[in-house]
Amino acid sequence: MVYLLPQYKTKLLRVPVVEKTVRVWNESGRERLKDCFEMTDWQVFIDSCDGLDELNDHVSGYINFCEQNALEEKTVKIFGNNKPWVTKEMKSLLNEKKRCFMEKNKERGKQIQNKIKLKMKECKKSYKEKIEEKFRTNDSKGMWAGVKQMIGFKDKETKISTEKGKEKEYCDQLNNFYSRFDTYDFSKEIQNIKKDVSENNDHILQIERHDVLKLFRSLKSNKASGPDDVKPKTLKTFAFELCDIFTHIFNFSLKFNIIPTSWKTSKIIPVPKSKTAKEMNDFRPVALTPVPMKCLEKFVLKSFLPTCEPYLDPNQFAYRAKRGVEDAILFFTNNVYSHLDTPKSYVRTLFLDFSSAFNTIQPHLLIPKLLNMGVNKNICLWILEFLTERPQFVFLKCGNTSFLSSINVLNTGAPQGTVLSPILFTIYTNDCRGSFNNIPFIKYADDTIIQALINTLNDLLNYYDEIEKFTKWCSDHYLQLNVKKTKELIFDFRKKNNTHDPLMIKNETVERVTEYKYLGVVFDENLNWESQAAKVNGKMNQRLYFMRKLNSFNVDNVILALFYQSCILSILAFCLPAWGGNAREKEKRKLNRCLKSACKIISENPQNFDALSLALCAKKLNKVIEDETHPLYPQIRFSSRSGKLIHIRTRTVRFSNSFLPFAIRNHE
């Protein structure tokens, strides 16, 4: 009888080698490209081209042609499993170890393993010194890239899975899905606006050469190019050589209110909203537009935004100077705490959700709003041109293969990812405001809250009335309210009569939730902040793991301290003044434990949760005091005799520990 003993061999996980062709930006290549642009007579392009479209296409094509010929191309292999500190010598030792394993030479294998350990320490030390040198030379981008490699941090990628052979069809379906709001024909209304506004005496906006130079030099080299393939690195590096021709193109566009078709073209990249993206609605349509167009948008925005500022809703916290997420959260929580401090009161909060809000802007409704704010009529015509007849296509990457959809031309919406779109949406929704002081509308871009501070039955009826008005306003402005994703959260600490009728919108019941995540902060109906603290604690512990991995490289303590401040402490500090005062001791202990572990690594005295909360509250209060236009400023009162802040009277502990009463009480 023969007994055959099976022998099993572990199969290693292998990442396929990726070959990539890149252009080498070395010194000789830069000099060749610079000479090419310096020797170019741009006047030849201007004289020989008929119209702005042709001129822009020729200039863009010429820039790409010069870049292709002046810069050398190099094919590189990317080994997925290789770390940057694995040198050739290290690789040869690892291969030698594999051979010993295959030959079952244990003695030789042990010797090689000892050599690998020593070599690994040497390689990691060398790589660590490179990263520290980048820090000393203020190369923050290179330093953070190296730190990510050391801690093993990778950006999460969600692959788009489609049926094989139907990728192009799916690509077209995505483009049609993103174009679904362009169903109305308002061409007559748009033509009437053009006719009424075109005859005006307003000055024509003009851009100077030094403005273009400044815009090009401020570009980030690593950003993606648009459909015209003109790279920001090229414009930034050769800003002096290219600014003349683009100054001419920009001024031509502003004078005649014409935008080249290629500049209005959007290359849509579907970006997953979550890890489990399956349906088309789970992908956010981010538009890549030409870099020169973004520069021109910045100039136009700077020209008309100061005119609009006085008219903007004070409860709109996005895209405003001296405003941010923290201000919106503080205004929201202060309303809740201060109102609940009065007897027999409760708060009903409606968190509204729009379907692709930016894609629903109607130009014929937006332009009159701009005109009413006193914006230059020629700028209004230029913005109208920017929003109408916009070609767009979807770019889809499945594995190593790319697919392009057919082109759709749109007259509705503003592309996500452009400079002007956010502020245009803010202006579009600017007149959507509450009619009652106790029912404010709090807005952060398209994240809108209707907050009802209720004491009486009449207040409740006003709340229902406001929702009805808001629904009608959305219908009149072609904004699609997603009732399924709209939620209601109720804060009610009354002992009796705390039953609430469900809210109805468009004959659909709005779901009432016990907690809701708004702008990164988790609110619960009991205001105990347990879920928020747990979320923060989980994130901090994840980053603490990365910090320990970084410490294993024996990096300089300054870099460790920077990592602690930027990646761990910042998580806790985010909106801490809004909830820190009312956090429970149980949650504080967990967070203090995490802070203590991190500070131990960098050999510093551990920071305390309460001390950090107090410091951040004081800092924020000073900013509010300095800004008289802040929505919280009217709540602050000064003594006529001493000039000191007057303490806010409170009835409940939760209001006493909230931001304003707590910060004013501890103000020096």
PLM features: residue spans?
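Non-catalytic, peripheral interaction segments enriched in hydrophobic/basic residues
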Residues: 77-79, 118, 130, 134, ...
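Short, conserved micro-motifs composed of acidic
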Residues: 202, 465-468, 480-515
